[in-house]
């Protein structure tokens, strides 16, 4: 039998305004460079949803494995964070580097005009930091993965952004456990989660539902 669960709004967290047709989404890089990535499928997708797109200054920057210096990536993110006309920030890809710029960011204007931050993998740094501040964010597909994203991944992202009800079905597995639970969903990439322990961006998992994603992670790294 399939396990299923439904995502509902948590009243104790701050929800950024859901998107409406005509809103603008900023696409930028907080971590790895994306020199060879084709953003056309992502732009076409946003336009099909009735949304506009702004390309950040970090798209195309190349500094070793990173999309520019820590200061360049932080400045690009800060610009979109402070712009009230930007309703969502979509991180183009993961990799490594977001943790190097998180302490350079000022969320003062974000608190005045909250917006959605979207991504997975290395973007877990931002999700966790926002969670400590009491804000919701979206762990979802990124522009670099859109060409190979499943229909379910695309659909759930759209529903999350536009405030539509979400539900998931999980296939049978011997590790599944049946039951009921209600709580705030936290987590993200495992290697990022343990790297943030002891920092101001570390999440409190007590009485919450912990979600973990990763691959090729060794047990001794988290022992």
Language model segments and positions:
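Phosphate-coordination loops involved in phosphoryl transfer and adenosine-cofactor binding
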Residues: 21-22, 114, 207
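ATP/NTP phosphate-donor binding region
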Residues: 9-85
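Active-site histidine-anchored catalytic micro-motif
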Residues: 66-176, 180-184
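Short glycine-rich or small-residue beta-strand-to-loop segments that form or flank ligand, phosphate
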Residues: 26-29, 87-91, 210-213
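Short, well-ordered alpha-helical microsegments
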Residues: 36, 98-99, 126-127, 194, ...
């Amino acid at each position: 039998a399939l396990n299923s669960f439904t995502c509902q709004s948590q009243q104790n967290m701050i929800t950024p305004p859901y998107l409406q047709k005509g809103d603008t989404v900023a696409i930028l890089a907080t971590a790895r460079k994306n020199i060879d990535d084709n953003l056309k499928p992502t732009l076409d997708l946003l336009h099909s949803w009735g949304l506009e797109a702004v390309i950040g200054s970090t798209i195309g920057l190349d500094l070793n494995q990173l999309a520019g210096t820590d200061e360049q990536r932080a400045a690009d993110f800060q610009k979109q964070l402070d712009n009230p006309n930007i309703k969502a920030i979509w991180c183009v890809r993961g990799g490594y580097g977001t943790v190097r710029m998180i302490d350079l960011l000022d969320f003062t204007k974000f608190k005045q005009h909250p917006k959605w931050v979207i991504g997975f993998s290395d973007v877990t740094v931002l999700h966790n930091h926002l969670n400590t501040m009491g804000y919701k964010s979206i762990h979802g597909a990124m522009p670099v993965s859109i060409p190979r994203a499943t229909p379910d991944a695309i659909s759930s992202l759209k529903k999350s952004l536009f405030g539509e009800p979400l539900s998931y079905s999980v296939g049978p597995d011997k590790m599944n456990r049946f039951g009921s639970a209600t709580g705030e969903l936290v987590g993200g990439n495992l290697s990022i989660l343990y790297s943030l322990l002891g920092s101001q961006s570390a999440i409190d998992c007590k009485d919450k539902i912990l979600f973990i994603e990763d691959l090729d992670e060794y047990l001794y790294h988290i022992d």
